[in-house]
Structure formats: structure tokens, C-alpha cells
Amino acid sequence: MGIRAIVVDTAGTTTDLNFIQDVLFPYSVKALPDFLEQNQHNVLVENCICDTKDIALEPDADLARVTEILQQWVSEDRKATPLKTLQGLIWKQGYAHGEFKGHIFPDFIEAVKRFSAQNLRIYSFSSGSVDAQKLLFSHSDGGDLTEMFNGHFDTRTGNKLDKQAYCNILNTISLSPKQVLFVSDVIEELKAAEAAGMMTCQMVRDSTQRTGEFRKISSFDELLIE
């Protein structure tokens, strides 16, 4: 049957965690107050504000309180969809103004070209919004990589720690589980993908990170698909 598609995690797998934690997250925290003030009547932003109030169980929260909630969620690394949507919108401005480029590991830049040449389908699955993923790969320090991808998945597909999310991906891309390889640095994500029947591979870029009973690689250079 063979592998026909590769689904990659982003942070820690294709992208340095430090770029997310030290560049993108602080940028979004700093920009949130002005962004919400200036865009609160935009339909998408307004929906995110309402969703934030619903999740926080604070229906009467004013804009300042909503900002506090969202900034707290950033510090807690909450995977809440309204936060991820707003971060994507804020980062879009940062990329457009040239304030940063998306960090992508060089070995993935070469691998994604190799996989594409092999006619393998390539997808990303991240807790960051689909828009944020597209921004990362289109403004990467390796150039625009988006044409190499067949699609992207985020929290709307499901929680990355839940088997159902991976079942949903399989249903969307219409491949059998054994035709799909999921690559991530996070053990719990790999377990969930494995429970859905996917093939799995753990990316171990840091010798101190937790590892599980999975095939392991330290670089995409080691991932050769026959």
C-alpha cells in the first residue's frame, strides 16, 4: 500500500519552538489591546470576542477584560480557537510589515521539496489556526513553501491529543490510515494518531525531550519514503 501522505506537526517539528514562544507569542500579547480596539466591529474579530466571553463564562466582560483573558490564555498556552484566530490575524500584520519571517528548519525545507517531487501529499496539523500556518509557510526564511502543501488542519478539526481529530483528517483526505504518516515531537499526539491507525514517527530535535516507543528521527533528512 505504502505511504501516500505525510501530516506534520509544526512547533518543535518543522518550526523551532523558540520562534513561537520568543517571537510570535510576545508579539501577539503586545499587539492585542490596540488590535481589538481598532477591529472590534470587524465580524470575525467580533465573533472571537463573543467566543472568548463564552469560553471564559464572562458574558458581560468589557473589551479590556476580554484582552486580559486572551493575554492570560497566551501565557497558559491555551489552544482556544478564538485566541488562535486572533493571533493569526495579528501575525498577518507582523509578516506583512516585515517584522519577522517564519522560522522553518532547513532540513524540512529540503524535505518538503523532496516529498513534493515524489508526489506525496503534504499536510500540516497545528493548534495554530490554518491562516497562521499559511502565513508561517508563505513567509518562511526558506521562501514561500505553501505550493508544496495539499492542506492544513487546526483546532477546528479536533484536539491534537484526541484520536477523533486524526480520524477526521483521514476522512477529509480520503486515505486509509496506513497510507498516512504523522510526524510530531509530542508523544501524546503520536499516541492519538496511532490510535486512529496512522503510521507515526517522532521528531527528536532536542536530546532532553521525552521520547516514546515510536520510530525516531532527529531531522527530516532521515525520513526517506520509498
UniProtKB/Swiss-Prot annotation:
Q: What's a BP term from Gene Ontology annotated to this protein?
A: L-methionine salvage from methylthioadenosine
- Which pathway features in its UniProt record? Amino-acid biosynthesis; L-methionine biosynthesis via salvage pathway; L-methionine from S-methyl-5-thio-alpha-D-ribose 1-phosphate: step 3/6; Amino-acid biosynthesis; L-methionine biosynthesis via salvage pathway; L-methionine from S-methyl-5-thio-alpha-D-ribose 1-phosphate: step 4/6
Which top-level enzyme class is recorded in the Swiss-Prot or TrEMBL entry? hydrolase
Keyword set for this entry?
Amino-acid biosynthesis, Hydrolase, Magnesium, Metal-binding, Methionine biosynthesis
Q: Name one Pfam family in it.
A: Hydrolase
Quaternary structure, per UniProt, is: Monomer.
| Designated name of the protein | Enolase-phosphatase E1
Q: Which gene encodes it?
A: mtnC
